[in-house]
């Protein structure tokens, strides 16, 4: 009975939050109110409000405010500072004419490609490869928004389609050595090499190709439906005085991430890399004019871009975190796990149930890790008791958690991309919905075809 009540409360609040965001209310305010309401109800029900890693203040009421403080410090510090630095960097690149020079140079070879959607798919594959270097979905999305997004928009790709491309690369896990894959390999009782390279990677590649095709047709359909015209920017209208080599500057963060990864050079945080990139750009600006005042005034544009990012993106991330914690503390995720364990032992049925519940948990909490970490702990027990191959259950769940995050209006990557693109999170979700569902279907079908469903088939007994 308690499980039903927790689920009901979670669903009611989720529906209410979605309704008011769709009606045009501030997403930050709505998520804050929804999250605080859930935390208050959790406290009344006797649930612990703060994560287990945080010490209680001694009172539930102040614990709620304490959690907001924790999020402000964590998301306003590490992740938030990264987002603000990237937004400031993007604003500075526009100010000094580097983005204009990228468009001016790129327009010459790109004019031979008539379809902006082919360019969009090429950008999607590049973005997916970038996920090998940047493990954070939000970090990757923000990095792509600061680098690829302006280029895509300026060569004729709609803002919604370009935002969807930046939000969806991390929907499928491609990196064989990510923490999720290592944990999944353990739960599947397989070596990392066999699980990551021989089993998961082929399924991931198939899903990425399917999602790319879906992006092509879905974005084109939505653009036609919304009467969005595609016009290449007339390069003759670009009057930038920046030298041609400035075209490389917007991509220096990506180059830095690839170089300073601990293999080719020292492993540096992306914020450190961004500081280096900003210093290089400002030094070049000084060498062009030898005008210190002009350089300092230009950097003010970057600082204002950082401030705008705090108001439009970082605070939205904090509000989304409060909402996700509210769903977690009220027992919403644990209730979903209880439902999963109540189903029978038929392999395909159990796999589909786990996939659906993992997707639902990821959509509602906005986290790709938390639902998978919560569900994966019970995989060995479920598999052994049912005679099912653990990998048969783990692989679809692993991908479903990340796919579900891309459909969540409170996930960091969707919120950050929507904020930087200045569109609604629901517009991003609409744009990614069909490609994500296509990817999910491919993952399920490929798992059914490539991974043995029973433990006996694996052991040969």
What are these regions (language model features)?
Residues 82-85, 111-147, 316-320, 343-381, ...:
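Hydrophobic alpha-helical transmembrane segments of multi-pass integral membrane proteins
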Residues 3-7, 73-80, 108-122, 155-161, ...:
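Membrane-interfacial loop-to-helix junctions in multi-pass transporters
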Residues 104, 113-122, 153-166, 193-198, ...:
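Membrane-interface alpha-helices at helix entry/exit sites of multi-pass transporters
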Residues 70, 101-111, 150-154, 297-308, ...:
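Short amphipathic alpha-helical coupling elements at transmembrane boundaries
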Residues 127-144, 149, 154-194, 211-215, ...:
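Alpha-helical transmembrane segments and, especially, the helix-loop junctions at the ends
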Residues 1-5, 22-24, 53-58, 65-78, ...:
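Interfacial loop-to-helix junctions that mark the boundaries of transmembrane helices
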Residues 32, 52-100, 271, 275-334:
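Core transmembrane alpha-helical segments of multi-pass membrane transporters/permeases
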Residues 2-14, 18, 31-38, 42, ...:
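Long, contiguous bundles of hydrophobic transmembrane helices that form the permeation core
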